[in-house]
């Protein structure tokens, strides 16, 4: 009987495709491993897939030793990726393709505001007690005359965000989340050197990699409305989001190296077993002594 109930349950639960996507700008500490573990376990619970993506688009800060340490930590704790590991640095042609698509369809545009102009705009808004945001100077609109294109400024690419209404989604941890659309503004999706920005590449990759469920730290909650703008502009489906509380230091701030947090492999060097680290990370899920 119980086996039949389990089989019915497994058929009804949608197989989740999840991921963990660290940036190799430093080591992976216990907080990151915990988030990865939640993502891994959710995929396995639903007979789905867990994927690993290395977000290495920041050439100035990337650290090859950090990449190796991340991969070693995942191997040690027994959380292998179910698919080939993706590296964002190898996907720039893909990002350019979708940026060009947005430009061609009128969902993105070139902005020629200089750094000095942007700084002056910010200073003016702050002096008026306003939230600093882009003012749409270069946003094309019916009946609007755009400024003359300057010779000395390489443009950035901005996506057209909605100017009215709300951006809403249901978070699997926090419930219904609503953001005023006019607080998102037309954010940059490609820098003046052509490099795509974080929120753009994350949304594109999650869509193309087939993510159904995105489990990540709640420090990414504010990124979600921007990523939803990208999903909608490109016609992608929006995954389910689960924003997990982070491990904090005694003062309530995000745990960091300054607080004595060590990298994942540091626990191995100290003689900890991977099973012990695994169980410690699962305490929030209700695992404890005797269970």
Segment roles from a protein language model:
Residues 81-82, 109, 215, 267, ...:
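Short, polar/flexible loop-turn hinges at active-site or ligand-entry regions and domain interfaces
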Residues 20-24, 54-56, 204, 208, ...:
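Short, histidine-centered active-site or binding-site loop motifs used for metal coordination
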Residues 60, 88, 216-220, 266-271:
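Hydrophobic alpha-helical scaffolding
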Residues 109-110, 114-243, 248-255, 263-264:
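Active-site cores that bind ATP or allylic diphosphates and position pyrophosphate for catalysis
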Residues 1-27, 47-50, 164, 242, ...:
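Non-catalytic terminal extensions that flank enzyme cores
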Residues 5, 11-127, 222-236:
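N-terminal Rossmann-like or analogous alpha/beta NTP/dinucleotide-binding catalytic cores
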């Amino acid at each position: 009987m119980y086996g039949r109930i389990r089989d019915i349950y497994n058929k009804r639960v949608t197989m989740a495709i999840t991921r963990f996507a660290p940036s190799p700008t430093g080591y992976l500490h216990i907080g990151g491993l915990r988030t990865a573990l939640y993502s891994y376990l959710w995929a396995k619970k639903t007979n789905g897939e867990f994927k690993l993506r290395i977000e290495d688009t920041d050439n100035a800060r990337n650290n090859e030793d950090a990449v190796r340490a991340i991969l070693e930590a995942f191997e040690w704790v027994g959380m292998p990726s179910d698919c080939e590991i993706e590296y964002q640095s190898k996907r720039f042609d893909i990002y350019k393709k979708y940026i060009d698509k947005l430009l061609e369809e009128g969902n993105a545009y070139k902005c020629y505001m200089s750094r000095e102009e942007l700084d002056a705009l910010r200073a003016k808004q702050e002096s008026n007690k306003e939230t600093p945001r882009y003012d749409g100077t270069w946003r094309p609109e019916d009946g609007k005359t755009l400024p003359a294109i300057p010779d000395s400024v390489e443009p950035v690419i901005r996506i057209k965000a909605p100017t009215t209404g709300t951006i809403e989604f249901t978070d699997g941890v926090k419930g219904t989340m609503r953001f005023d659309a006019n607080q998102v503004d037309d954010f940059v999706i490609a820098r003046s050197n052509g490099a795509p920005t974080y929120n753009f590449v994350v949304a594109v990759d999650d869509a193309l990699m087939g993510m159904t469920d995105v489990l990540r730290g709640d420090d990414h909650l504010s990124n979600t409305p921007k990523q939803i703008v990208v999903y909608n502009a490109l016609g992608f489906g929006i995954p389910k989001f689960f924003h997990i509380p982070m491990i904090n230091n005694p003062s309530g701030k995000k745990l960091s190296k300054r607080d004595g947090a060590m990298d994942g492999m540091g626990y191995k060097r100290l003689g900890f077993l991977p099973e012990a680290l695994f169980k410690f990370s699962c305490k929030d899920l209700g695992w404890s002594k005797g269970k």
